[in-house]
Amino acid sequence: MAAKIRRDDEVIVLTGKDKGKRGKVKNVLSSGKVIVEGINLVKKHQKPVPALNQPGGIVEKEAAIQVSNVAIFNAATGKADRVGFRFEDGKKVRFFKSNSETIK
């Protein structure tokens, strides 16, 4: 099955502490989660790694968020949108459901 949310898509968070925030998808995980730039930041306690010259400390990084809690952002309408699929010239492409505009 083709993915409705892909890497480098701009998405908007629908639920949770970051509701309403927008960001770019960095990674789509096979477990049904996505990692979005600047969204769902958590603090990790990291041990120093002298071999790699990495200092220890508290590091802030993005955690995964369920794909059902984000929606693709339609720049034309300025709102969250749903994704559909159709065939154009023998290729399967994604489109916004609200205005039938092809994505990328």
Swiss-Prot record:
Classification via SUPFAM superfamilies: Translation proteins SH3-like domain
Give GO terms for biological process: cytoplasmic translation; ribosomal large subunit assembly; translation
Q: Which UniProt keywords apply?
A: Ribonucleoprotein, Ribosomal protein, RNA-binding, rRNA-binding
Gene Ontology cellular-component terms listed = cytoplasm; cytosol; cytosolic large ribosomal subunit
Q: Where is the signal peptide?
A: none
Which molecular function GO terms apply here? large ribosomal subunit rRNA binding; structural constituent of ribosome
Q: Which Pfam families match?
A: KOW, ribosomal_L24
Which InterPro entries did the record assign? KOW, Rib_uL2_dom2, Ribosomal_uL24, Ribosomal_uL24_CS, Ribosomal_uL24_KOW, Translation_prot_SH3-like_sf
The answer to whether the entry has keyword rRNA-binding is yes
Q: What does this protein do?
A: One of two assembly initiator proteins, it binds directly to the 5'-end of the 23S rRNA, where it nucleates assembly of the 50S subunit. It is not thought to be involved in the functions of the mature 50S subunit in vitro. One of the proteins that surrounds the polypeptide exit tunnel on the outside of the subunit.
Identify its protein family: Belongs to the universal ribosomal protein uL24 family.
Assembly description:
Part of the 50S ribosomal subunit. Might contact the SecYEG translocation complex when it is docked with the ribosome.
Output this protein's name.
Answer: Large ribosomal subunit protein uL24
- Supply the source organism for this entry: Escherichia coli (strain K12)
Q: Which gene encodes it?
A: rplX
